[in-house]
Regions:
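Soluble catalytic regions of membrane-associated enzymes that act on cell-envelope
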Residues: 194-554, 561-602, 610-616, 620-622
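Residue-level recognition of alpha-helix termini/interfacial anchor residues
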Residues: 138-142, 460, 660-664
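Phosphate/adenylate-binding glycine loop and adjacent helical scaffold
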Residues: 598-688
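Residues that form generic nucleotide/phosphate-binding pockets
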Residues: 54, 103, 134, 204, ...
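Bacterial/eukaryotic Sec-type N-terminal signal peptides
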Residues: 1-7, 543, 547, 557
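Intrinsic-disorder-associated interaction segments
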Residues: 6, 248, 252, 546, ...
Length: 688
């Protein structure tokens, strides 16, 4: 092997690799100097650490973009010495690809405040005229790139030792070396052995999200987002109804609020009144059950596979919103919808798209004063949740890596992760640890047992409703897991100070035709359960002894509603629960109920907002849908209506409706506005 691979330190392979890494490090330094004004202040230790981590993130770039160089250097035994210029040219081309992409983005990041990915080509393609002023304004970058190109061409190491792989002389050794080279390239290009290939968004796992762009590079961002479908440019004009209250004008870049509203800043939720008459700042726990469709519940008028959940829904301390719709059909679409207020209006998944690094607000980040955590009993890298949530401000992510190793073998389902019952008990133990009396907790747990292939622990086989191996059977198991979760949690001191939100990430199979319709196929439960909080009268008489209580609690109690008497408060709840909501509305509704004044999150609004009529949107087969039960309207990418119908839950047949009337005009204008605004804001990374 000494003859095959000479001293690495003396080989040109090592020198060229070192030069490639040096170029990326240098371009990172230049990018930092040019963009330091919008980055948060960091100390020298953080800066050095970011560069060291950046070298790790440069590995896929060095392997991928310089692959022709390495193939020539390692396998070009017969031609390498005869044609040294080929090595030089290949290295210069690869190097300039890196430098040009980083160089262009050095100036462009000053505008977007982020690293650009493949969408940069879409932007330049949409309007090539933008590029000329950019070159003029950033002439020094162009000049620097030209100088770097000349330097690389002159100084790239060509003469010297190279690995000597000769298939004719030693075919077996050559085969082994080839397979080794391929394995190293594959592992390096993926960035290691983790579940998903290394992407720019993963930088937030190493440094604070605000300086993650310093760690990564534009070439890596382009590689991460290569061949993404992106977002279309909607050229149609919004057809506003007469006397419209919709304030959206996507053509006007200075439009103020539109349908989207990110005006909610860091939010200290006020104290809530307990059933015992005291006041607490409650814990918030989200329980998102995999594939939990409303169809599977008793309150959904279906076969009751969820007797315990039905019991919670009927509890006096529960508010049920019966017209809630998921914004997507995949688990990966749930996180941005619920926790960022971002519906699924892309043909690809937002979490893994070119725009995942956009600076959208996140409920975990906005909940000021809370410890925040997200729990999912699957691999830490699954669906990109950990990287996405960490870069939007989540404090703790708990996946299978954080599950007790001594329990793993017993509780692993053989497919996705930890069975629901033991994982929810693990979640309780973590809640015990987090509830140290210093800060309330805002945590979410996402179950997984009711995911295909629908496995449950052996003791429960043939003992639950539903056919084994079906989603209904595993939903029945998830209901048992919820029952045991609440039985254990009820013994904990933090239980009565906690508000629970229960919903599903999306729906699944059904034996009813309605639940395959464009409305029924998206219906998920939405329950707010507060066992120890006076949830239905939480704002009643909030001003009583307000000044004294504020002195005691040292917290301002913003008034959400006009402190109505009980009969009026019941009317408010009844009005809110009759509205059509989407997953985007869950957080604002919860916060509004807990006392926050007019909270907004992305495209989500509160059901208690008297000015919000309520609706849900999603995309299916390149058609865009808006639901305001029982009405459903669909548009194509040209903004043309392709379907408008009405369908009730107790009727499997939909009723086609004429394309006219105030309801039709409002739905069409609202969906057209959201399509245009969603696309424009994501492309421009505009979230003000």
């Amino acid at each position: 092997m000494k003859k095959l691979f000479p001293s690495i330190a003396k080989s040109n392979l090592f020198r060229q690799m070192a030069m490639a890494f040096s170029l990326l490090t240098f371009s990172r330094l230049v990018w930092f100097v040019a963009n330091v004004f919008w980055l948060p202040p960091i100390g020298i230790n953080e800066y050095v650490y970011a560069h060291l981590v950046g070298i790790y993130f440069d590995i896929p770039v060095v392997i991928g973009l310089f692959l022709p160089v390495w193939i020539w250097v390692i396998f070009g035994h017969s031609w390498r010495d005869k044609f040294p210029a080929i090595n030089r040219i290949l290295f210069v081309i690869s190097s300039m690809t890196v430098l040009i992409s980083n160089g262009i983005d050095t100036g462009y990041s000053q505008v977007t405040a982020k690293r650009s990915g493949y969408e940069l080509f879409d932007i330049l393609g949409d309007d090539a005229n933008r590029f000329a002023p950019y070159i003029i304004d950033n002439w020094y970058i162009i000049l620097g790139l030209a100088a770097m190109g000349y330097f690389i061409y002159r100084w790239v190491p060509i003469r010297g030792h190279y690995p000597d792989i000769n298939f004719r002389m030693r075919p077996l050794r050559g085969l082994i070396a080839t397979l080794t080279f391929a394995a190293i390239c594959l592992i390096g290009f993926r960035g290691g052995f983790q579940l998903r290939p290394l992407r720019s968004i993963d930088a937030s796992n190493f440094v604070q999200p605000e300086i993650a762009p310093l760690v990564t590079s534009t070439p890596l961002q382009i590689i991460s987002t290569w061949k993404r479908n992106g977002l279309p440019n909607f050229e149609f004009d919004v057809q506003f109804p007469a006397n419209s209250t919709i304030t959206s004008d996507p053509k006007n870049s200075t439009s103020q609020k539109w349908l989207f509203d990110n005006s909610t800043t860091l939010l200290p939720l006020p104290m809530s009144r307990t059933l015992g008459g005291g006041w607490v700042q409650p814990n918030i726990v989200f329980i998102v059950v995999e594939s939990l469709a409303r169809d599977y519940t008793g309150f959904g008028n279906g076969k009751p596979f969820t007797p315990y959940l039905d019991k919670i829904a009927a509890d006096p301390q529960t508010i049920q919103f019966p017209y809630c719709f998921a914004n997507g059909t995949k688990s990966i679409e749930m996180v941005p919808s619920i926790f960022c207020g971002m519906p699924s209006l892309m043909s690809e998944f937002y979490v893994t798209s070119a725009y995942a690094n956009n600076k959208v607000n996140n409920a975990f980040h906005l909940a000021k004063g809370y410890k925040t955590a997200f729990f999912h009993g699957s691999n830490n890298g699954t669906m990109g949740f950990q990287s996405f949530l960490k870069q939007t401000g989540l404090q703790q992510y708990h996946g299978i890596d954080q599950y007790p190793s001594e329990l793993y073998k017993r509780d692993f389902d053989g497919n996705w992760g930890i069975f629901d019952e033991p994982y929810l008990q693990h979640f309780i133990r973590c809640m015990d640890t987090m509830n140290d009396g210093k800060q309330p907790v805002f945590a979410s747990v996402f179950t997984l047992s009711s995911h295909h292939p629908y496995t449950i622990p052996e003791p429960y086989l043939n003992k639950l409703r539903g056919k084994p191996g079906t989603v209904q059977h595993t939903i029945a198991y998830a209901d048992i897991a919820l029952q045991k979760f609440f039985q254990t949690a009820a013994t904990k001191p933090w239980f009565n100070n906690t508000v629970f939100v229960i919903t599903g990430d999306h729906t699944s199979h059904s034996d009813k035709e309605y639940f395959y319709s464009q409305s029924g196929h998206y219906e998920v439960p939405f329950l707010i359960y507060a066992p120890g909080i006076d949830i239905k009268h939480i704002n009643e008489k909030r001003n009583r002894s307000e000044e004294l209580r504020n002195q005691q609690l040292r917290i301002q109690q913003p008034q959400t509603f006009a402190n109505p008497p009980r009969n009026e408060w019941a009317d408010i709840i009844n009005t809110a629960t009759q509205k059509t909501l989407s997953q985007c509305d869950i957080i604002p509704t919860l916060w509004n109920l807990l006392g926050a004044n007019n909270p907004r999150l992305g495209f989500g609004r509160s059901a208690f907002d008297p000015n919000y009529e309520g609706y849900s949107t999603h995309i299916d087969k390149d058609l865009y849908y808006i639901i305001q039960y029982p009405f459903v309207l669909a548009l194509n990418q040209q903004g043309k209506v392709v379907d408008y119908h009405k369908q009730l839950r107790n009727n499997n047949k939909s009723q086609k409706l004429p394309l006219e009337g105030p309801q039709f005009e409002w739905l069409r204008a609202t969906l057209q506005c959201q399509m245009k605004e969603y696309s424009l804001r994501i492309k421009q990374n505009r979230w003000e």
